[in-house]
Amino acid sequence: LIAAGRNRTPGEPLNVAPVLASNFYLPDDRLYSRSDGTPTSDALEELLGGMENGKALSFASGMAAAAVILLRLPVGSTIAVPVDPYHGVAGIINEGEAQGRWSVLRLDQADTPAWLDALQTCDLVWLETPENPLMTVADLPTICAAPRRDGTIVAVDSTFATSLNQQPLDLGADVVMHSATKFIGGHSDLLAGVLITRNDELLEEFRHRRLLYGATIGGMEAFLTIRGARTMALRMERAQQNAMELAIRLEAHPEISRVLYPGLPSHPTHAVAATFMTGFGAMMSFETTGAGERATDVCNRMELVNHATSLGGVETTMERRAVIPGQERIPPTLIRLSVGCEQVDDLWADFLQALAAP
């Protein structure tokens, strides 16, 4: 993360990749930034691809990266997807289904036998693990290594885990997607996405579709993503320590009815996660006692923790997910928590005062 993506040619700026304002180049190997990217995005792709021993392609957002995978499917395709995926991905899938473009098989991510069956019948198997916001972990070693129908693509959204905690390509996945907006960037100041694969044919298809969809990352965004990625290991180490401690304390609090964090032995997929994840991430969800209004009240009373959407920054954020359109199936008292790098006792003091209020 620290050494990759640096130009070591004598006389070149080693410390940071240059940000070039020009959107075109005099004819050579690179002509136009929408089709060919920039030297800054090249450096970013070297860095991110190296994290998973693959080849990376950067995008203007995580949703742009996801759309390139989904919209490559021809009419009549079948997609296997978790019951409660990220709502943006669900929006694309639901729209395509309503238009008759594809059929959708919605599966409990913990139901490994169902996913193994899907490998024999579906054109795309889309896994999101840990899943947003219930934190269900898929059995990636079993699913990704299982026999599949010729042409079936296994894609893994690894945003919550990051490459530091799981390596889907090593397990047999075809492509990994990250919303680099989140933990890779890490400072809540950019939009970016990435696809990583070891399949050169897929990589070139993704590159062509990135060109067609105008989804190439900007130079400044690529620069910011590189800057953020340099410290990801340090940030994740601190955030995961905080997350584990908060999960333990919240689980013991009388005003909390349930905590969903893969690192807790009480989590339904903890045993699966422990077999292949090297860390459990900085994302969790918990449910308050009472009704949905109680969860909203807790969010509004927090002083240090930000009540806002998005996640993965150095600051801790929380959000009541059931109020998001399309997320009505989520328990009304569930709050998703993205744990940051603050002092854990400061965070806990904030929770105590918010939960103590009537």
Model-derived features with residue positions:
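Short conserved active-site loop signatures built around small residues
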Residues: L1-V19
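Conserved PLP-enzyme active-site core in the AAT-like
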Residues: A3, N7, A56-H253, L260
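Short gly/pro-enriched beta-turn/loop segments at secondary-structure junctions
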Residues: P13, G219-M220, A252-P254, T278-G281
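Conserved N-terminal alpha-helix of the aminotransferase class I/II PLP-enzyme fold
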Residues: V16-R72, D84, G88-E97
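Short loop segments at secondary-structure junctions
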Residues: N23-F24, T197-L202, A229, T288-E293
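PLP-dependent enzyme catalytic core of the Aspartate aminotransferase-like
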Residues: G100-S103, L116-D117, L140, R235, ...
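Short amphipathic alpha-helices in soluble, non-transmembrane regions
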Residues: F206, T296-E303, D350-L355
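Conserved C-terminal alpha-helix-loop-beta "cap" of PLP-dependent enzymes
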Residues: R258-I335, V339
